[in-house]
Every structure is written in C-alpha cells, then in structure tokens.
C-alpha cells in the first residue's frame, strides 16, 4: 500500500515498523463545541484508513485522544457559568453521538489529557534536564526551539521564516520568540495541578507527546492539514528531543473543507456542524460526500454536492434492492453470461483494491463501485441474462461485494428497502412534501386500479406528479419516489 507521507512529501510504500502490527495515533478534538464538517472529514478519513489496514490483515492499535483542558474549554465554561469538566464531558459525549451516526468506529485507546498530567510533567522535566526546555520565574515552561536543529522538517519552514512572524506577548518570559509553552503557570479561576514549577496546566502540544509516548515509535501519526504547523511540528521537536527516535514513520494529513468556496467560519455565517447537516440529510449521505473526494484534496461543501451524493446512494441501494428481488423470484436456466461482462465484473474488484492501496483513493474506489452497479443494472434489465445461473452467481457476488464495501468504506451496509424509505422521508421533509398526503393518494390510486377505474388512477398519478412524486407499477404493487 502506498501512503503520502507529509514528512517526505511523496507517496511511500507502507511498511509497518513491527511485522504485522500498526501503531497509529490521530489527534482528536478539543472538547469545547459541537463537531463541524471538518472534524467529520478527518474522523472519516482515518476511520477508513484503519479499516483498510485491517482488511490487509494487519493488527492495528488505533489511538485517538481528547483534549479536555484548554483555553477554549475554560473560556466556554466561564462564559456559560459551568465547570470546565462539565463542558469537556458534554462535548465528548456529543462527539460520540455524531461519530456513531456517521458510522465511525471507536478508537482502541482514547486517552484524555487530564488523565496524563504526571506523564506530561515527567516529559517536561526530561526536556528541562537535557537543556531542551527552561522554566521561568513565573512558573511557565518553554521549549527551546533552537535546541532541536531539525525543527521545521515536517512543514518545510525555516527558522528565519518563522522568526519574521514570531512575537513575545507582554508578560511572557521567553528566551526566544520561537519558543513555545510546555507548561502554563496557573491563572486565577483556571484549573491547575501542582508541579515542580508551581501550579499550572499543560500546553496543547505536550499533551499529545505524553499521550502517544507509550506507543512509540508510531507507524502513522495523522490529523487535519491545519495541524501540520505548529502542532505536529512541535510534537516532533519535543518528543524526538528526548526519545532520540522518530516520533512516527508516516505523517498523514487530510485536506481542508470549505463551504460554498469560502473558508468555514462563524463570522461568515457558514459554520456547519455535523448536527446542522444531519437535520436535512441522512448520515450516510454525508459520509459518501466526504469520501467522494481524495482525502488530501480540499473539498467544497455545497447543497448541490450533497444532493449528488444522495442520488448516487439511491442508485446503489436501488440496485441492491432489485438484486434481492431478482434472487427470490427468478427461475434459473443453465446458460452463461457474455465473456466481456464476466471479465469486466472480475476486473472491477481488482481495480477497487488498487485504488484503495494507492494512497487510500476512495474517490476512485467509488468510481469502480458504480461501474459494478452499471454492470448489475445491465444484467437486471436483460431477461435472458437475469435468468441465467451465471447471472444468479454474479448477483449473489454483488451482494457479497456490497458487504465488503461496508466493511472497508462504511457504506452500503443498510437494508436497501429501509434506507430508500428513510431517503424518501428526509428528501420529502426538505421539500415540505406531506408524506401522509402522498400515502393517502397512493392508497386511493391502488383502489381505483383494483376497480379498473383507470381514468381516476391516471388523474391520481398526475396529482402525485404535481407534488413531485413519481409512481411505478410493478407486479408487487406501486413503488413511489421523489422526482
């Protein structure tokens, strides 16, 4: 498998440091607000990466942390008159709810910063002892950036470039504007812990170094592209300065999310939480949308893009439903399928594997899935092919492949009939279509057809079309969908 390594700035063959085992650490949320679409993308990317590694037969230990003490958490607690621990727990619970809805599997280990205060202090003490960090008279501890010559190797930034934008805030006792905080001296009204430098709390960067320490060296360290600098750059410096080993062999970062071609921000009024989106769309639609673009590419969140994802899911689930029906009603004949159809079917499974092994190219993998759906639809639409025993085998293989796609991508795993009903419901809600009214018209039309009142049946079909509802008559009865 090839993975793009931010450190080497190229795709590299993935080789675990320990045969058959993978240690992977991904930076999780700072628990002060509901997760937005950027959090969803990062979570989904690394969820699929873990799934793919396990599909390859590797034993993966996946660690994803929670930052549960931070300036943003403290500020929110003070603003709302709450205990900071209550704020953190509220949004950790919300994270789990959102991720469960999106089908994101839980990490194997989920450390919290406040459970590792001793490890954080121990790491700070080692850095001070080795001259890589220093304590100030006010009780802050800073990392000496110039003490780590490779600083900037991940982001590709030079010290001169960084120095031009560095500042020392009033009251800070930094030796150098480049230095960053490992331990912050206590302030009135803030949580703090006793330490060798006086009461205080950890800086953001040191938390991840301490929480990942017992899994070193890591095979993969991941996160969003926004974490490359300064967070991951600082993690490398403070960890490698004392462990004298590589923090991680592969650094994997997912691209940014924009909303309607603009940066997502509360000030622009386009800030989209996962919960906002799932009021109007099914969770699987958001999952499909985010996996429909290569993970390193930027993605633009639009209603049009979500509508297209919805249509794509409709095609796949409709093919799955029609396949299930065909397998229960057909009488099979001993006849082969066209050689080209059989060859194309076999080739697509291999092509999907190649896409997933080429830097987790989910966009290309989904393209191969839709090629398979087209092949299945071609078979279903041809009575001769559909009734062939070889056709039955292909349809059964289609259902088996869909189960594998669900295992690897977290898609197409629901019961087709139930999913399509949920899809109709949520699309109808977006369009303010009254489903009980639709169902009443369908019932009336069914009665008209039973009474052979075809003029009335046609009038009711038109009434449904005027509502945006199409009706298809089948041997099993009426099927309806939204136009």
UniProtKB/Swiss-Prot annotation:
Its main location: cytoplasm. It is found in: Cytoplasm. Zn(2+) binds at residues 27, 208, 231, 235. GO terms for molecular function: ATP binding; cysteine-tRNA ligase activity; zinc ion binding. Pfam families: CysS_C (PF23493), DALR_2 (PF09190), tRNA-synt_1e (PF01406). Its EC number is 6.1.1.16. Monomer. ATP binds at residue 266. The keyword Zinc applies. Keywords: Aminoacyl-tRNA synthetase, ATP-binding, Cytoplasm, Ligase, Metal-binding, Nucleotide-binding, Protein biosynthesis, Zinc. It comes from Desulfovibrio desulfuricans (strain ATCC 27774 / DSM 6949 / MB). GO terms for biological process: cysteinyl-tRNA aminoacylation. InterPro entries: Cys-tRNA-ligase, Cys-tRNA-synt_Ia_DALR, Cys-tRNA/MSH_ligase, CysS_C, Rossmann-like_a/b/a_fold, tRNA-synt_1_cat_dom, tRNAsynth_Ia_anticodon-bd. This is Cysteine--tRNA ligase. Its cofactor is Zn(2+). Binds 1 zinc ion per subunit. SMART domains: DALR_2 (SM00840). Belongs to the class-I aminoacyl-tRNA synthetase family.
